[in-house]
Design a protein with these regions (language model features):
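Short, well-ordered beta-strand elements within core beta-sheets of diverse protein domains
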Residues: 138-144
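Short, charged, surface-exposed loops that flank catalytic or proteolytic processing sites
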Residues: 144-150
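Short, well-structured alpha-helical segments that form the helix of a local strand-helix-strand
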Residues: 151-160, 312-316
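Histidine-centered catalytic/metal-binding microenvironments
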Residues: 436-530
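C-terminal/peripheral segments of proteins
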Residues: 15, 26-29, 36-45, 58, ...
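Substrate-recognition/cap regions that form aromatic- and gly/pro-loop-enriched pockets
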Residues: 325-462
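A contiguous strand-loop segment
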Residues: 2-134, 154-289, 294
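Glycine-rich, aromatic-lined ligand/substrate-binding cores of catalytic
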Residues: 230-364
Length: 530
């Protein structure tokens, strides 16, 4: 999928949380209705078969419960995309990445080979399944891992065993760490821990630009990789460093810097970092330190100020506001306004922002913020993933267009607003601000309810310990603490209240923008009938 990702380390976020976020964008010319669901252990398959690649994988017993945002239409598979499990581990999968011919020549993709002929006849060749891909990743990994690091290890092992038919980037987070994994060819992979004080921007391009192979093949403190990566690089002459003392650069070795990258990928990283580090360097003009087409925009950077949930939503909704490249703007001309691929694009399916908060008890530590549809015109609102069911307004997405579920209502609103951007912009902004404030208020109020419910637990721990974690626990203890039926009922009730308020406000926005755009129709006539 064509997506955009931002990862925010705990010391770079406004409240000490780890934050991972990704737009899921459908392919050009397609829309992909999404659902927000809880997958219970008895609903998780024990034997999995991919729809696209036909690969079959036996899965462990005793999976953890987890949230997901799968397709409403399962004809191409589940595509779970984003979720949080009972160990308070979050996963976002995947960001489609680019590569190069040298990598694919050395380690080809593992693609489905259809059967030839008919079984029993001369010349028959049976089908050869492909590897695993975005369709499968969340389902195969998230229910079975108890830390972000375990997520990297499990996905890496699956990639080495089954291979993949596409290049992908995947984020994992827990309360302490964020890890970013990038696939390399058919069977190889690298992963790097996001620095606590930094954020990471990822368009659809292999991004890691500095990698410690000794650490990855040794202690794995900040880096991990497939077991034979060093030999793979050396055997296929993939390290392009001029000097031996230069840190290994995976972006040069495994990635791309094509003409299409310069209109589709690098401008997105440029705009996100331009917004989050406005004073760090010169961003505009001929003397800019980095142009939108630069191939060396850093993978990770320390922000000029702490990053909020609203900052994450803004950059993942952006269409180059304040630059000549804004398709809705008045700067530049028709050529520049359609020069680069916006981040907030028409074919956005969903945005999930997963926040793991160290200052909350384990039972309500995780928050999954959700938006559906095209980001410039939608809103991002919070839901607690530690529940046994999700609100119907977000879960019961149909393949039929209707204003009765959140996905399609947002899709309709976006189409109306695009046609009358300037005239509807104020209504959309008021809606986003109001629903965002409602979301923060819901989280705060629910936190208070949980505090009263687990007061004895909170008093037991020192909130000022060296990690800032008010309830530090081993993974198995986290799972036990999270499986609190009474707390789950409180969180589910809060989610239902949020969804009801969200629907009321979204209905009002639809009413408003439908009226405005209808009044702007080209067949209107301002003289009253007489």
């Amino acid at each position: 999928m064509a997506c955009t990702t931002i990862l925010v380390g705990k010391d770079a976020s406004y409240d000490g949380s780890t934050i991972i976020a990704r737009n899921e964008d459908s392919a050009n010319g397609e829309f992909c209705p999404k659902r927000f669901i809880v997958v219970k252990p008895d609903e998780q398959p024990r034997h999995y078969k991919s729809v696209l690649s036909h690969v079959e994988v036996d899965l462990p017993d005793e999976p953890l419960q987890y949230t997901a945002v799968p397709n409403a239409d399962l004809k191409e598979g589940i595509w779970g995309e984003a979720g949080v499990n009972e160990a308070n581990v979050a996963m976002s999968a995947t960001e489609t990445l680019t590569t190069n011919e040298r990598v694919l020549g050395a380690d080809p993709f593992v693609e489905l080979t259809p059967a030839k002929g008919k079984k029993g006849e001369d010349g028959y060749e049976p089908e050869v399944p492909g590897g695993i891909g975005e369709e499968d990743f969340l389902t195969l990994v998230l229910p079975y891992v108890k830390t972000a690091r375990e997520g990297v290890a499990r996905l890496g092992a699956l990639l080495e065993q089954y291979g993949t038919y596409e290049m992908n980037g995947v984020a994992f987070s827990d309360v302490d760490e964020i890890w970013w994994l990038e696939t390399v060819g058919g069977h190889h992979w690298i992963a790097k821990r996001v620095p606590d004080e930094a954020y990471v921007t990822m368009p659809n391009q292999l991004g890691i630009d500095e990698f410690d192979l000794d650490d990855a093949l040794g202690n794995q403190e900040e880096h991990m990789c497939s077991v034979d990566l060093g030999e793979f690089i050396e055997r296929n002459h993939l390290d392009l460093a001029v000097e031996n003392v230069t840190p290994f650069n995976p972006r040069d070795a495994f990635g791309s810097h094509s003409d299409s990258d310069h209109v589709y990928n690098t401008p997105r990283a440029w705009y996100m970092q331009r917004f989050l580090n406005p004073y760090d360097e010169q961003w505009d003009g001929q003397d800019a330190d980095h142009q939108p087409t630069a191939d060396d925009i850093p993978w990770a950077r320390q922000p000029d100020r702490k990053i909020t949930i609203e900052d994450v939503k803004y950059v993942l909704s952006s269409h180059y506001q304040g630059t000549p490249y804004d398709p809705y703007g008045k700067l530049g001309d028709q050529r520049t306004r359609h020069m680069f691929r916006p981040i907030g694009i028409n074919r956005q399916s969903q945005l999930s922002v997963m926040q793991i908060r160290p200052y909350r008890p384990q039972v309500n530590r995780a928050v999954q913020w959700i938006a559906y549809g095209s980001n410039p015109f939608n809103t991002l609102v919070p839901f607690f993933p530690n529940v046994d069911s999700t609100p119907k307004y977000l879960e019961d997405t149909t393949t039929r267009v209707t204003s009765e579920n959140f996905y399609w209502e947002n899709r309709i609103i976006a189409a109306l607003c695009d046609a009358s951007f300037a005239d509807t912009a104020n209504a959309v902004e008021r809606y986003q601000e109001k629903t965002g404030a409602m979301g923060h208020r819901m989280v705060s109020t629910t936190d208070g309810q949980i505090d009263r419910l687990v007061e004895d637990v909170i008093d037991e721990f020192d909130a000022d310990d060296e990690t800032g974690d008010v309830q530090p626990m081993e993974p198995d203890e986290i799972i036990e603490a999270v499986r609190n039926g009474e707390a789950r009922e409180v969180l589910a009730a809060a989610n239902e209240t949020m969804a009801a308020q969200l629907k009321a406000e979204t209905d009002k926005l639809l009413d408003s923008v439908l009226y405005t755009t209808s009044m702007n129709m080209k067949n209107g006539f301002h003289m009253s009938d007489f």
